[in-house]
Amino acid sequence: IENKQAVITAIRVANALHLTIDPLVRFDLKNYFYSDLLKGFQITQQFNPDGKEGYLDIKGKDGQIKRIHIERIHMEEDTCKQLHFADYSLLDYNRAGVPLVEIVSCPDMRNGTEAMRYVEAIRNIVVYSLTSDGKMEEGSLRCDVNVSLRPYGSTEFGTKVELKNLNSLKNIEQALDYEIARQSACLLSGTPVQQETRRFDEASGRTVLMRVKTDAVDYKYFPEPNIAPIQLSEEFVQNAIATCPELYEAKKARYLELGLSETDADIILSDIDMAAYFEKAFAKNGKIAKTIANFLIVEVNGYRNKNGVSMKEFPLPEDTLADIASLQEDGYTHKQCIQIFNDVIENGGSAEEARLRLKIEKQASDDGLVLGFVNEV
């Protein structure tokens, strides 16, 4: 039977990508023989994908908003992890058969930067919808990229080259820019581009030939006979959407309303655990959210980097950081608050207890009072 949570997850991602959701959940068999899936077929959704015809807006290389259209999103089972070496390959079947969501994009991206930002936006959606942790280096989020060039004014695409082994955002940008330059050089010299699969070599910053592709394979799709189709009710679909956690862009808009800069909001949202910590810290007093954000980005991240701890391992409770930020808002200097911050981490207790331990007093800021002290002296 269908995995209910997988269906809910696919609906949430499809909605976030502005796709038209198909209420009919039906699976098909993709038949092929290859070492990545030994049973000889893959369960997928060729004819009834979860969603069709959506889009995602990103910031282009020129800083302007660019819309990337999305053809479809569908569920299918994962294949094994393959590690290729000079004269042998290793196959890890531990993830084979696990459900995944595949997003098929339209050919709207024109350079490595746009592709990188598109994948980054996808990652933000899957992380904040709790679909995946989005760790590309661990394979939780993967992408293959098809690159082809065409003359200016032409409506027909050139020969397609598929790129693999793109396990970071930086690799995506570098691999595409290199491949665009490589194909340009081929075409300008009169050498036709071959239809092939290439991998990105991180050490050299180049793409390397893996295999030459032949004509398209006929996978002979037919309905999966062992999984009955399900017609989802409108209530089920809307409930899946309504119960989706707050997504990256919605959180970012809210943080900007709190007074955070776009840069600070992006830094906090780059780590979902940091965003959760921030939410709890300013829950008592949203007026000091900007001060809390400054402590979080500078002092907390500084401590984490120095001590090699994750956000979940950071020892200071959220409300204590909020209390330290409140002291600064009440007139204590930033330097004094940093002393309190460090003392609480080292000795525990509340912000007020640390202030008393350190015998820190608020510095006088009344000019008349200061002038009176000067006259007395």
Whereabouts are the PLM-identified features?
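Core structural elements
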Residues: 139-151, 256-279, 289-306, 319, ...
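Amphipathic alpha-helical segments within well-ordered protein domains
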Residues: 252-256, 279-283, 301, 322-328, ...
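Short acidic alpha-helix initiation/capping motifs at coil-to-helix transition points
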Residues: 242-249, 254-259, 269-274, 315-319, ...
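Basic, nucleic-acid-interacting segments
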Residues: 1-246, 252, 262, 284-288, ...
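Strongly charged, low-complexity linkers/loops
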Residues: 311-322, 329, 334-377
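Short, structured loop/turn "capping" segments at alpha-beta junctions
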Residues: 186, 289, 303-307, 332-336, ...
